[in-house]
Design a protein with these regions (language model features):
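Nucleotide/phosphate-binding catalytic cleft detector across ATP-hydrolyzing
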Residues: 1-92, 100-218, 224-270
Length: 270
């Protein structure tokens, strides 16, 4: 696979993919070498960053700028990261969740955990197998998550009909699943994200922690769309929590705007 848990594992294929996108953006006949910004999880090592850089240069880049996911997410969410105040971003992707407190254009405290949106689907699959002896696929689990999934009690519980294979008889079976059951299924994964948020807050300098308390926590990434996540984090931390306007595209938009941010920073220095 090209990606394992949203981290690049095949650099030869990565190089070819980046080359394809460069040609698509500039045209095959273009002789210009572009400046490319590449986003990576905050937990990657310097060796992994260097490997990404090398693959991007080999694909035809003139220069490469590496940006950590929380920084990209913050820029994409419309946060001015150049200010000396603290902003907290929780970016929940498919394979990793990146949590960071950002100030003066960089991460002050950050962590990356391999618990994210894909784990929500897997948790529902496991729950259905254990609780109902029902085998369902990840696509069905995702459908359950989107339609009635929650990690916080709903004012009005919801239900959905789920079809799968009975593990006892081997025959098709349809059951009714409630939103309360998804809350139970997702509890462990979502609480691990909350614990990571706690951990970052505990390591944050007092002045920046006070800024976060005033400004709130911003959620980005597809995983942030899980119902109840705002309420759960807010309840456990006591800090106002909100989801960015377009959470699924924040990282992509921020990665694109990062070069502009660096150019503005250089202008300020001169």
């Amino acid at each position: 696979d090209l990606y394992k848990r949203q981290v690049i594992s095949d650099y030869t294929v990565t190089e070819k993919m980046i080359k394809h996108f460069i040609q698509k953006a500039l045209g095959k006949k273009s002789f210009r070498k572009p400046l490319v910004s590449v986003c990576v999880p905050s937990g990657v090592t310097e060796v992994e960053k260097k490997a990404v850089e090398d693959a991007t240069f080999a694909a035809g880049a003139r220069d490469v700028k590496i940006i950590e996911e929380p920084i990209a997410a913050a820029i994409g969410a419309g946060i001015d990261i150049s200010k000396p105040c603290g902003n907290m971003i929780v970016d929940i992707g498919g394979g990793t969740s990146d949590i960071a407190v950002i100030s003066l254009g960089g991460s002050v405290v950050s962590t990356s955990i391999k618990i994210a949106g894909d784990d929500f689907d897997e948790a529902i699959v496991r729950y259905m197998r254990k609780k109902h002896n029902l085998l369902i696929g990840e696509r069905t689990a995702e459908d359950i998550k989107i339609k009635i999934g929650t990690c916080y009690p709903l004012a009005q519980p919801e239900t959905i009909e789920v079809r799968g294979r009975n593990l006892v008889t081997g025959l098709p079976r349809t059951i009714t699943v409630s939103s309360e059951e998804t809350e139970e299924a997702l509890r462990e994964a979502t609480l691990q994200i909350v614990e990571a948020v706690h951990s970052v807050l505990e390591k944050t300098p007092p002045e920046l922690a006070a800024d976060v308390a005033d400004r709130g926590i911003v959620l980005t990434g597809g995983g942030s769309l899980l119902r109840g996540l705002e309420e759960l984090i807010e309840e456990k931390t006591g800090i106002n929590t909100m989801t960015a306007e377009q959470p699924m595209t924040c990282v992509a938009i921020g990665t694109g705007k990062y070069v502009e941010f660096l150019a503005g920073k250089r202008d300020e220095e001169f």
